[in-house]
UniProtKB/Swiss-Prot annotation:
It is found in: Endoplasmic reticulum membrane. It comes from Rattus norvegicus. CDD domains: PTPc-N1. Found in several tissues including central nervous system, liver and kidney. A high level of expression was found in the hippocampus. Substrate binds at residues 181, 215-221, 262. The gene is Ptpn1. InterPro entries: NR_tyrosine_phosphatase, Prot-tyrosine_phosphatase-like, PTP_cat, Ptpn1/Ptpn2, Tyr_Pase_AS, Tyr_Pase_cat, Tyr_Pase_dom. The modification Phosphothreonine is found at residue 367. This is Tyrosine-protein phosphatase non-receptor type 1. The modification Phosphoserine is found at residues 50, 242-243, 335, 362, 364.
């Protein structure tokens, strides 16, 4: 298959970073004026991830129709997705209002609430203890009906009720719970098993509204999920499955939402998932059983997230231009946070072993510039705090820089002695 050959060539050359950069440079750029309005600032999780004006989802609210969500409409594949950010505490009601208004049957969540000690998403559905949630701002009630917990994903059956009309609908919530904090799943088997579970539920069928897909920013993992699904669908529809070009499909999707696929590793994983998924498209139905077996979905799920230790007390830096920067602020959401922080960390922590070191050189300059530009996140705040080594100089350095208090006194004594001796000599010469 052409795609498999292309994958092997790129892998062998260690060229994923360069190809990813090419896609970034070719991607569409459209205005995001509505997202940048002051009144919408607190509805954005990241300051640099905004929906394009032409493809944004509009709520049916009279006062403000904005939500950070985009409609991705793939004409040839006849598939539509709504890609959105993880809801904020103040946008959970808007999220479910969008699900209701767009007549969506399924929600795909690809992140955990807490990752690496940071809050990535609000708890926008009821847990077992509470059973239901009421969103007063949008007049909706959400009830947890059932929960099927597997080793790496959970499927929840929810009931969404419009309290104004008393109408209720079933919503399926597919939660992928073990996607690595930074990077990609170890193999495409578990991912494809999850994707086909979503497909088999009917949540992606055209008789329902677009499926809602989100991670934290709604571009990286969400883009990976939608790209793999669309490419497999196109391979199934076309007479020549090998004619599907993953890069072209991704560029088409980026016309509707910025930044889809955030790292070279995610691009590489998308290729792997499509190549493996193509075996099923080509008629090998046994692979689906293999995916299920390899994914070990019937094992015990990993333990719940253990909260991180408390952060140090808040400290402030010296005033700068009339403002103080707060260190270690533990906000639930900060609109000034930049998604670029995640991107930089992802590049540094989750590079695939197959990517050669020299291939990363094309990214190094860009990464350094962006590191200097990122100013709002915890990473930059921590960078401004001296390290332990900086605060604890060596003994020799301490001796060298220790103030010697007796030196000025000694100098004064010497000068006084010299003056007194000179005066005495003058007296003796002149008067004796």
């Amino acid at each position: 298959m052409e795609m498999e050959k292309e994958f092997e060539q790129i892998d062998k050359a260690g060229n994923w970073a360069a190809i990813y950069q090419d896609i970034r440079h070719e991607a569409s750029d459209f205005p995001c004026r509505i997202a940048k309005l002051p009144k919408n600032k607190n509805r954005n999780r990241y300051r640099d991830v905004s929906p394009f004006d032409h493809s944004r989802i509009k709520l049916h609210q009279e006062d403000n129709d904005y939500i950070n969500a985009s409609l991705i409409k793939m004409e040839e594949a006849q598939r539509s997705y709504i890609l959105t950010q993880g809801p904020l505490p103040n946008t959970c009601g808007h999220f479910w209002e969008m699900v209701w208004e767009q007549k969506s049957r399924g929600v795909v969540m690809l992140n955990r609430i807490m990752e690496k000690g940071s809050l990535k998403c609000a708890q926008y559905w009821p847990q077992k203890e509470e059973k239901e949630m009421v969103f007063d701002d949008t007049n909706l009630k959400l009830t947890l009906i059932s929960e099927d917990v597997k080793s790496y994903y959970t499927v929840r059956q929810l009931e969404l009720e419009n309290l104004a009309t008393q109408e209720a609908r079933e919503i399926l919530h597919f939660h992928y719970t073990t996607w690595p904090d930074f990077g990609v799943p170890e193999s495409p088997a578990s991912f494809l098993n999850f994707l086909f579970k979503v497909r088999e539920s009917g949540s992606l069928s055209p008789e329902h509204g677009p499926i809602v897909v989100h991670c934290s920013a709604g571009i990286g993992r969400s883009g990976t999920f939608c790209l793999a699904d669309t490419c497999l669908l196109l391979m199934d529809k076309r007479k020549d499955p090998s004619s599907v070009d993953i890069k072209k499909v991704l560029l088409e999707m980026r016309r509707f939402r910025m930044g889809l696929i955030q790292t070279a590793d995610q691009l590489r994983f998308s290729y792997l998932a499509v190549i493996e998924g193509a075996k099923f498209i080509m008629g090998d139905s046994s692979v689906q059983d293999q995916w299920k077996e390899l994914s070990h979905e019937d094992l015990e799920p990993p333990p719940e997230h253990v909260p991180p230790p408390p952060r140090p007390p808040k400290r402030t830096l010296e005033p700068h231009n009339g403002k103080c920067k707060e260190l270690f602020s533990n906000h639930q959401w900060v609109s000034e946070e930049s998604c670029e922080d995640e991107d930089i960390l992802a590049r540094e922590e989750s590079r695939a072993p197959s990517i050669a070191v020299h291939s990363m050189s094309s990214m190094s300059q860009d990464t350094e510039v962006r590191k200097r530009m990122v100013g709002g996140g915890l990473q930059s705040a921590q960078a401004s705090v001296p390290t332990e080594e900086e605060l604890s100089p060596t003994e020799e350095e301490q001796k060298a820089h220790r103030p010697v208090h007796w030196k000025p006194f000694l100098v004064n004594v010497c000068m006084a002695t010299a003056l007194a001796t000179g005066a005495y000599l003058c007296y003796r010469v002149c008067f004796h």
